[in-house]
């Protein structure tokens, strides 16, 4: 039986009684954001909206984006990445579980020195895939041209933010490359691997 989103007590400043709000609402007030699903337009718009709102509310306090995502659509993922570069606060990215495909692209987009993976997390990178498997030839050619542009964009970002040479990134994007947390750190996708029992999110 589904229980819905858990609720937790929250007391607004100046109020005596606490109100019950859903746990994500409470965490958002602490500037903690979550990408825990496939990247699509809906979740992208939610995260972009939250980042912009929290940046306007207080541009000096950092944001924390927790990622456990199998990837998803490229353009919505790029929208999240671009917003992370646009907003005033630094955006910490934290990989928990899996950051694959566009999940890893968003992970690498965090503020350099503030990208972290949990010790048993996994990261996977690869090139963008086509959605036209049985399309007419003309549509497939147009799709291939757009995919090439997107691949160049993703490659350029990975090169810039990992410090790896172009040829290394290009070769990695040719196939699915899975990395442990420490391998992702060596690859420049994250800067730190969390130590167990050292977290403090209060």
From Swiss-Prot:
It is an enzyme of class 3 (hydrolase). It catalyses: Hydrolysis of proteins to small peptides in the presence of ATP and magnesium. alpha-casein is the usual test substrate. In the absence of ATP, only oligopeptides shorter than five residues are hydrolyzed (such as succinyl-Leu-Tyr-|-NHMec, and Leu-Tyr-Leu-|-Tyr-Trp, in which cleavage of the -Tyr-|-Leu- and -Tyr-|-Trp bonds also occurs). CDD domains: S14_ClpP_2. Cleaves peptides in various proteins in a process that requires ATP hydrolysis. Has a chymotrypsin-like activity. Plays a major role in the degradation of misfolded proteins. It comes from Piper cenocladum. PROSITE patterns: CLP_PROTEASE_HIS, CLP_PROTEASE_SER. The gene is clpP. The lineage of its organism: Eukaryota, Viridiplantae, Streptophyta, Embryophyta, Tracheophyta. InterPro entries: ClpP, ClpP/crotonase-like_dom_sf, ClpP/TepA, ClpP_His_AS, ClpP_Ser_AS. Its EC number is 3.4.21.92. Keywords: Chloroplast, Hydrolase, Plastid, Protease, Serine protease. It comes from the Eukaryota. Its main location: plastid. The keyword Protease applies. It is found in: Plastid, Chloroplast stroma. One of its GO terms (cellular component) is endopeptidase Clp complex. This is ATP-dependent Clp protease proteolytic subunit. One of its GO terms (biological process) is protein quality control for misfolded or incompletely synthesized proteins.
